[in-house]
Amino acid sequence: MEILRGSPALSAFRITKLLSRCQDAHLPVSDIYAEYVHFADVSAPLSADEHARLQRLLQYGPSLPEHPPAGRLLLVTPRPGTISPWSSKATDIAHNCGLSQILRLERGLAFSIQGPNLNEGQWKQLAALLHDRMMETVFTDLQQAEQLFSHHQPAPVQRVDILGQGRSALEQANIKLGLALAQDEIDYLLTAFTGLGRNPTDIELYMFAQANSEHCRHKIFNADWVIDGVAQPKTLFKMIKNTFEHTPDYVLSAYKDNAAVMEGSQVGRFYATAEKGIYDYHQEEAHILMKVETHNHPTAISPWPGAATGSGGEIRDEGATGRGAKPKAGLVGFSVSNLRIPGFEQPWEENFGKPDRIVTALDIMTEGPLGGAAFNNEFGRPALLGYFRTYEERVNSHNGIELRGYHKPIMLAGGLGNIRADHVQKGEITVGAKLVVLGGPSMNIGLGGGAASSMASGQSDADLDFASVQRDNPEMERRCQEVIDRCWQLGEYNPILFIHDVGAGGLSNAMPELVNDGGRGGRFELRDILNDEPGMSPLEVWCNESQERYVLAVAPAQMALFDEICRRERAPYAVIGEATEEKHLLLNDRHFGNQPIDMPLDVLLGKTPKMLRDVTRLQAKGDALQRADISLAEAVKRIMHLPAVAEKTFLITIGDRTVTGMVTRDQMVGPWQIPVADCAVTSASLDSYYGEAMSLGERAPVALLDFAASARLAVGEALTNIAATQIGELKRIKLSANWMSAAGHPGEDAGLYDAVRAVGEELCPALEITIPVGKDSMSMKTRWQEGHEQREMTSPLSLVITAFARIEDVRRTVTPQLRTDKGDNALLLIDLGAGHNALGATALTQVYRQLGDKPADVRNVQQLAGFFNAMQRLVADQHLLAYHDRSDGGLLVTLAEMAFAGHCGVTVDIQSLGNDALAALFNEELGAVIQVRAEQRADVEKLLADHGLANCVHYLGRAVAGDTFDIRSGTDVVYSEKRSTLRLWWAETSWQMQRLRDNPDCADQEHQAKQDESDPGLNVKLTFDPAEDIAAPFILKQARPKVAVLREQGVNSHVEMAAAFHRAGFDAVDVHMSDLLAGRTDLQSFQTLVACGGFSYGDVLGAGEGWAKSILFNDRVRDEFEAFFHRPTTLALGVCNGCQMMSNLRELIPGAEHWPRFVRNLSDSFEARFSLVEVASSPSLFMQDMVGSRMPIAVSHGEGQVEVRDAAHLAALEQSHLVALRFVNNHGVVTEQYPANPNGSANGITAVTSVSGRATVMMPHPERVFRTVSNSWHPEEWGEDSPWMRMFRNARKQLG
């Protein structure tokens, strides 16, 4: 084992935070220093040259002050027996740099602790504080890291002696292996294997448990029901299917695949052809697929990997739909118990305790969103939608007074994608078809995820919880998706016959499911499975849940093509078996010469015992709202701090919202970028205004009073959230229903049945809406011992509805931004509660630790449908200036958020809403506030009346310029406050979370910036006409110069980059680094090169640095790049990851010697912003006629801060006039202040060019916003092309 020291690992503020945590834990630590240390497992000693190359490879990241480690060593590494994602990717880079004798690289974090007065118990306490016990271990000596590379002999399969010991042997195995088998399933297995005349193996039992777990089989949703002694006519699943039977319109696939599919639009899908690799538009149907999953159990145990693999698994579900599909846009949601932010605890937050085996709600909301965002970011899928609810209270619900909350959290992961018409249905698995595992190797992780997540927290052994934690490698999943993309793009020649993702249960669930769904059996070889841990037993190899894997059936004649695609994308795969005529599973193990699995498929997946739920209804209790202690002014302040209501910027700016270039509505609204969007919208392609929308609906606390009302409201809210997009008819909307329940808890089962019936049998059929997809999680309870008391925290029944729809015109989407620049205006409330104004289970009751008695509900189904249809007319006719639905916090919050988005005031009169101001302002009945022009008010009110809404419409008042927020009832002032004051209250929760998680100085700067009342918002100043196509004369000549659209594994922004160059008149050619390294392509034939954004190698050796070093350490490819850069007629552009990469190639680029490096953002966080930049005077040929222009641009990076050697280096860069772009604030002043400058770069620098101007590198993404509709905000006068299109046309003009 080689040991190589790395760079300092923690910034000053991270060390300060660590010291503060030590202080809070009463640990007398005076100083901490941390640096990376690298360990290399080598097959042969490295030569001096190889050692130097490895040393250079491992020099990465920001240049932080070094000092010799002093104090006692605590070395934090991945757990022995596991392989970290860092290791997988760093080893790939080493191999691509010619260091083939390196078997594996691993990294640790070496803490040098100065704490001379710590006793041994305190050292153990400190070690626990420094690492995640689920993922890491702590050593006290560097040599102990040798354990990371320990190799073990494979363990043999174990047999369970049922022939000798009978039922007791199965019962013991059930406990030992954590199988969560029911008694009737034990009986079933005993009968089955006795009939086969042999003892089952541990792997067969484990496989059965996973395949038949509640997680995978949905037993409760398929159960028979008896309620109050009366047999019920339908299962839960049949009631959901009733929506499809009633309204099958536009649904192409439901209930039978990894995701549902509905009709989309005929558009030009943009991708490179297989023959020539040239990008072009292909006119075809882009149907819409939809899926929403939950990943609750792993997120409670270890939030980052739990949430990350939740998003990753859902992305795989989308990609594995039909014969291969394309994930496009994602959503993430969280329900947790109270945060109790230190120093910011809220009046309603009591600490009821929790078990040690799960983390706190604060931990979940600190780490979980980062994990979900990081996976989506690295994979290259924008996360555009979400929700965040906290609930934890002692309430009087159906079962009397008890604790209700989310100690077992909800982690929601979902999204939409596109699929070709001819790939919607799975193909036929032919006998002899090759059975393939695509993706990374097996590792001993995530064992038991399906069975573990099917148990209430506290029922399973803590070691089994530990075993079910997973790890994420989104860059590997991206490689696999690129393979799937290449396959579906082949159309009828697609080599994929059948595909499933690998999720719960690993291959033990995926492979039987694959062959069974294809009507076949399978014969497999265990030792052909890619395996990074050969010491695993057969059970561990077959059943582990290593992520980023798919199982496929490929025709033998197509294997050569499939192999070629995988090699080019560097996506590992293994052929592990063949499909058989007989529906039988045979798993051979050539190492031991036996068959760990040899069983008929119908034993595994056949008629296992059907569940019967015999339950009793309980009536909700609740308590009348006690108003004595409620003051309206105090209520407003509390509600503005409630996470379900409060600003969620801290959850949003960590997630890339612009990748693909097809995002037309993200969470951030208007010139002030306020996170209040009601829904997410994407364009169907890069050449179309057709699109897709998705929205969420969720009202879980209402279930504590009325199960069915809670479910109806979830559907209603999803509809009111999506209503201000141009959809057309209501039946175009399709829903995903995710049901979370504590099955078995008194009253909950019958409540679940009533809720499903309310939606599946009544509401959705009446609205003609289908639920073609969904998921259930039936173990939402946590048990623990608190002192001598046994406690339980039970989740409310929680239905999360996601609405999906095809969009007629993405430009018609209306946002909550109030407009004061459109003349006199009117604000109208459409109250679908029709005056009921119920306050039960609202934000108001929650912040006063009450529940109330009567909740909101869908009062009139016809009016709900009429409301949607009326909004469709108003959207199509462009009569709406602003729209925002009423939800958490009620009317007051709706108006406040609209005013925040418009940076304006409101004056309203609520007299028509009744005499109870508290109920009028804080009820959460369905509805919306719309803003219309004053002169159109009468017409709008008539249209609403024509749709049956006459009794729901109330004129409130108007939006006004300024900082007022005034609510009156007739002549009485009900509430008056500055809008800016409300805005700061609303922002405080996000600010406090950001301070805890990121650089607190940056969080403080952002909070301070929100207090600038003179902020004009994003604005534009152009020195050129963006409507002028300066490339047109050259395009007319029909000469299309070739641009090499360069990507490395992990790059994810190449398609939109190719589209921008294509529009400017180039032939954009897909060039993978593997093409250059293998000599299949060279740069000789290209006049332009663009290095694209993303996460090459997952940024493990510094952003873009691994990519650059794979060029620098390969002599032939290095020479090729150097020759290209020295050719006097070439152009080169590097964006984001490509910018970082090219900055590390500056020794090859003439006139680039003053270029800086790009390192970790000052905030120490990934930053996704829509930032204002100014084009500086520089030689850049890409920006030659844009100098002086100021306009917003997409920013998405974690490592964009300019790093120079010293002040002299910065001065030389400036004096050479090589700075091409700078961040400016909304006043147009160059800035280093966060967040206007999202990465902290000196002098606002965010792009530089070479002396000749032929090579330009920039951190922001012009390719994602070259279309006007792809800008989060834009002036109304812009046409199809945004001003950033000029960059690409300048390049085309330059080439003549």
UniProtKB/Swiss-Prot annotation:
Residue ranges for the region (Disordered) are 304-323, 1000-1019
**Pathway(s) of this molecule:** Purine metabolism; IMP biosynthesis via de novo pathway; 5-amino-1-(5-phospho-D-ribosyl)imidazole from N(2)-formyl-N(1)-(5-phospho-D-ribosyl)glycinamide: step 1/2
UniProt similarity note: In the N-terminal section; belongs to the FGAMS family.
User: InterPro entries recorded for this chain?
Assistant: Class_I_gatase-like, FGAR-AT_N, FGAR-AT_PurM_N-like, PurL_large, PurL_linker, PurM-like_C_dom, PurM-like_C_sf, PurM-like_N_sf
Family annotation (SUPFAM superfamilies): Class I glutamine amidotransferase-like, FGAM synthase PurL, linker domain, PurM C-terminal domain-like, PurM N-terminal domain-like, PurS-like
Protein name in the entry: Phosphoribosylformylglycinamidine synthase
GO CC terms in record: cytoplasm
On whether Lyase is a keyword of this UniProt record, the answer is no
User: Which residue positions are annotated as catalytic?
Assistant: C1136 (nucleophile), H1261, E1263
The record's SMART domains line, in alphabetical order, gives: GATase_5
Instruction: Please spell out the taxonomic lineage of the organism that makes this protein.
Output: Bacteria, Pseudomonadati, Pseudomonadota, Gammaproteobacteria, Enterobacterales
Q: Name the enzyme's class.
A: ligase
Q: Which GO terms describe its biological process?
A: 'de novo' IMP biosynthetic process
Its recorded reaction(s) are:
N(2)-formyl-N(1)-(5-phospho-beta-D-ribosyl)glycinamide + L-glutamine + ATP + H2O = 2-formamido-N(1)-(5-O-phospho-beta-D-ribosyl)acetamidine + L-glutamate + ADP + phosphate + H(+)
Where ATP is bound, by residue?
G306, A307, A308, T309, G310, S311, G312, G313, E314, I315, R316, D317, A677, S887
Q: Where this protein primarily resides, as one coarse class?
A: cytoplasm
Any one Pfam family match given in the protein's UniProt record, by short name = FGAR-AT_N
Name the residues that bind Mg(2+).
Answer: D678, E717, N721, D885
Role played: Phosphoribosylformylglycinamidine synthase involved in the purines biosynthetic pathway. Catalyzes the ATP-dependent conversion of formylglycinamide ribonucleotide (FGAR) and glutamine to yield formylglycinamidine ribonucleotide (FGAM) and glutamate.
**Which residue numbers delimit the Glutamine amidotransferase type-1 domain?**
1043-1296
